[in-house]
Amino acid sequence: MTKLSLLPLLALASAVLAKQDAFQAKCASFGHRIKLPNVHVNFVEYVPGGTNLTLPDNHVTCGASSQIVSADMCRVAMAVDTSKSSQITLEAWFPRNYTGRFLSTGNGGLSGCIQYYDLAYTAGLGFATVGANNGHNGTSGKPFYQHPEVIEDFAYRSIHTGVVVGKQLIKMFYSEGFDKSYYLGCSTGGRQGFKSIQKYPNDFDGVVAGAPAFNFVNLISWSIHFYSITGSNTSDTYLSPASWKVVHDEIVRQCDGIDGAKDGIIEDTDLCHPILETIICKPGASSTTNCITGTQAKTVRNVLSPFYGVNGTLLYPRMQPGSELFASSIMYNGQPFSYSTDWYRYVVYNNPNWDATKWTVEDAAVALAQNPYNIQTWDADISSFQKAGGKVLTYHGIQDQLISSDNSKLYYARVAETMGLGPEELDDFYRFFPVSGMAHCSGGDGAYGIGNGLRTYNGAEPENNVLMAMVQWVEKGVAPEFIRGAKFSNGVGSPVEYTRKHCKYPRRNVYKGPGNYSDENAWECV
């Protein structure tokens, strides 16, 4: 190759290098340009793709000391005052491969943890992304104690503040600004998405809200009420994990085939009403390896029953059957649920010594009457979001061990009744997809790989990815009729055993054949 023929290649390489240098230079100088009210820049740094980013300031309970970053990006770390006595820690990740889209991530549990894996996931897909710590650090609810401003940040203000600041920063960093804004969150993040829809209907064009923790105060009470059913691990009413496996196996035996296929997955728990007398030990049985006592059967029946208040009002629907194995070590472990204990101690009663083992349904009434900053997130009139042209896609794992998927069905019904809209009308802006075989936000026994994060990723195509399906809905008007899930052989990144199209509610999946249950085309939404 002659020197003359090399010139075009050298020119191209120089142009690419110049572009890279320009992006890095812009990032290096960006911190000095940020002059926004209440915003205090901690640092700005360029992070090359492939970096394993260390996170020394991440609280130890948040569980992440590092995060692999897949794309070149400019990282902006800030503190933003939300009142005279509160502030959020906020990060904005601006990728080189920017697609003109803004996105906010959410949080989980009671936590004040920036979800760096969601920042990495969405920035890698070309979104300019923000994530905040919800106004406090760590997974405990103790920072709420006698700090109403911190509770307000947690209830709604952290997300909205991050959106306002993030959109301003995008316009400063990218000359083209942004075209559309999106939200992605699960659990508490799902609740935050719906809180944005209800309170700030213009914040997002598209919201992907998974396993939402709305009906929040009653969820807190529902979660702690399991202890009053199971008792401690020395009680006759308590079931060990091994006993819960006996229960689970029997529930699957009775309900698995209702959908037409014996694949170990319950497609529609609305049709599953297990008869637990079948596994009560026979009189004089010398072993309880494959059976439970009558007292334990009553425990299971109560666990799988709706939760009612002091006046008989439904507070929270039943735990859906099929989640027993995942829930046994968390919800039915012979101890009051830790998040609920924290909420009652540090918010409801402002008493760090409150004894969670003494909880009664009267306490649930006190908590609901309090409902600070309307954290319930249970408003069913979302017409302002509809009129603003917003779209919401919500999904919920049918094996969810922390938040009953029946609660998402209940909210869907409330919206339909409040707004006077049937499924066809709701489809214009609100679509709900129950996901069989999915536990809480990820994991499970079935096809849970729907692309709602790094742990469920199976491609960026809209048909395989709920976030990109939302982008296609917002930007091209093509709404998802199903969301495809992947069943991994051993977690994300391992071979895919099969895929399944999860139906849009209120339709449900039925095996029609021909072919094996692993063939997604052998199933039909009815």
Curated annotation (Swiss-Prot):
Location (main, coarse): secreted
Pfam families per UniProt: Tannase
Residues of this chain annotated as glycosylated in UniProt: N52, N97, N137, N233, N311, N516
Presence of the UniProt keyword Hydrolase in the record: yes
InterPro entries linked: AB_hydrolase_fold (IPR029058), Tannase/feruloyl_esterase (IPR011118)
Keyword Cell membrane: no
GO molecular function: feruloyl esterase activity; metal ion binding
Name of the featured protein: Probable feruloyl esterase B-2
UniProt lineage: Eukaryota, Fungi, Dikarya, Ascomycota, Pezizomycotina
